[in-house]
Amino acid sequence: MKTLLLTLVVVTIVCLDLGYTIVCHTTATSPISAVTCPPGENLCYRKMWCDVFCSSRGKVVELGCAATCPSKKPYEEVTCCSTDKCNPHPKQRPG
């Protein structure tokens, strides 16, 4: 019984030591895809802002992984989250 308990403790420690990786949507690839974030980057983010084509194409959207939530500039909307695929693209931007 002690051997079984010790084995379970060791397995638990090994599994916890592997760490958790999060899956985020990213615009670094075309088309937009979901990727497993590198170790240490445990947040998904979505940045949106208007460029010169905003009135015809809509906002520019940047999606990705981050270790810390990116700093927000005055003209940007930034959201961060910490569950798999929690940063979807609000809509596909034309062309």
Curated annotation (Swiss-Prot):
Cystine residue pairs: C24-C44, C37-C65, C50-C54, C69-C80, C81-C86
Keywords from the UniProt entry: Acetylcholine receptor inhibiting toxin, Disulfide bond, Ion channel impairing toxin, Neurotoxin, Postsynaptic neurotoxin, Secreted, Signal, Toxin
InterPro entries: Snake_3FTx (IPR003571), Snake_toxin-like_sf (IPR045860), Snake_toxin_con_site (IPR018354), Toxin_cobra-type (IPR054131)
Signal peptide range in chain numbering: 1-21
CDD domains associated with the record: TFP_snake_toxin (cd00206)
Gene3D superfamilies recorded: CD59
Entry's localization field: Secreted
Tissue and organ distribution: Expressed by the venom gland.
Cellular component, GO, one term: extracellular region
GO MF annotations in UniProt: acetylcholine receptor inhibitor activity; ion channel regulator activity; toxin activity
Pfam families for the chain: Toxin_cobra-type
Record's subunit section: Monomer in solution, homodimer in crystal state.
Family membership: Belongs to the three-finger toxin family. Long-chain subfamily. Type II alpha-neurotoxin sub-subfamily.
Function: Binds with high affinity to muscular (alpha-1/CHRNA1) and neuronal (alpha-7/CHRNA7) nicotinic acetylcholine receptor (nAChR) and inhibits acetylcholine from binding to the receptor, thereby impairing neuromuscular and neuronal transmission.
Record-given protein name: Alpha-bungarotoxin isoform V31
Source organism per UniProt: Bungarus multicinctus
